[in-house]
């Protein structure tokens, strides 16, 4: 079974920053408030919420001045495949949801989930315990989520994760979203006809290819803007925008301010 490296995090981010994930996993918000954005949608988490997210890039901001404390539980594909196979008979009792899985799912932590998390944290503090105990606690947590009120949506997301064409598309798009290709070129390079490519894309991401590419580029530009000294015109070109004015319009629509204002806010908050 895959090794799982669970990490306790502390974030202080009053403005949106980009967080990239190469694998799927769970966040448990132990303290504070935090907002996640994906494809223009905002997901607000309060203390005691749990978040399941698929691999990808997200904009994140803490809602309080105090640090947000989170527990990150990665869920590698091999671990999830073993989990689904091991408990397949039991999970088959849960109804299926055939809609496109959402990139993010928020769970309220019930008393039984809270107890499961406490047990997991207790094991993490013991270096003398074998790693299999951690894996068993995570399996327990996944089963509780599967049998929660959002269990059908959660299982639908898990079942899609093992789909090889979908995994290949995710890898392909992360490697090529900055390419200045037409959509037909993306489809051809991926090895599909345009119609089939669009259908697969909708199944994986739930939005159109153009909308996803635009969102991914604006997040990349946002990261360059806040973490470097490149000029705004150079950032626009680097992120694949046809002009600085188009980039500024897109950025304002996405974040509610211009790139220049965002950079000034970053300077003011960090000193």
Curated annotation (Swiss-Prot):
Regions that span the bilayer: none
Keywords: Activator, DNA-binding, Plasmid, Transcription, Transcription regulation, Virulence
Disulfide bonds: none
Classification via Pfam families: ExsA_N, HTH_18
DNA-binding region: 184-205, 232-255
GO molecular function, one term: DNA-binding transcription factor activity
Listed GO biological process terms: regulation of DNA-templated transcription
Domain HTH araC/xylS-type: 167-265
Protein role: Transcriptional activator of the thermally regulated virulent yopE gene. LcrF activity could be modulated by the interaction with an inducer molecule serving as a temperature messenger. The availability of the messenger would in turn be controlled by a temperature-responsive process serving as a cellular thermometer.
Protein name stated in the entry: Thermoregulatory protein LcrF
């Amino acid at each position: 079974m895959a090794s799982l490296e669970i990490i306790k995090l502390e974030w202080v981010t009053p403005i949106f920053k980009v967080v990239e994930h190469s694998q799927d996993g769970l966040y448990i918000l132990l303290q504070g408030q935090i907002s996640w954005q994906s494809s223009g949608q905002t997901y607000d988490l309060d203390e005691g919420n749990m978040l399941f997210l698929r691999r990808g890039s997200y904009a994140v901001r803490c809602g309080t001045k105090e640090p947000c404390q989170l527990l990150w539980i990665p869920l590698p594909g091999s671990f999830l495949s073993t989990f689904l196979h091991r408990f397949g008979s039991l999970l088959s009792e849960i109804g299926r949801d055939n809609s496109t899985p959402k990139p993010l799912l928020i769970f309220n932590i019930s008393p039984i989930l809270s107890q499961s998390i406490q047990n997991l944290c207790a094991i993490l503090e013991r270096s003398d315990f074998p790693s299999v105990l951690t894996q068993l606690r995570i399996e327990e947590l996944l089963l509780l989520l599967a049998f929660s009120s959002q269990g059908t949506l959660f299982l639908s997301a898990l079942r899609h994760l093992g789909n090889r064409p979908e995994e290949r598309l995710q890898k392909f798009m992360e490697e090529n979203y900055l390419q200045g290709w037409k959509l037909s070129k993306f489809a051809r390079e991926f090895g599909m006809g345009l119609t089939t490519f669009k259908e697969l894309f909708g199944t994986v991401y739930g939005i159109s290819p153009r909308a996803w590419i635009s969102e991914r580029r604006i997040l990349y530009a946002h990261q360059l803007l806040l973490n470097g000294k490149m000029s705004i015109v150079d950032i626009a070109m680097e992120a694949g925008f046809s002009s600085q004015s188009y980039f500024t319009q897109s950025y304002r629509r996405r974040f509610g301010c211009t790139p220049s204002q965002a950079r000034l806010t970053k300077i003011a908050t960090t000193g």
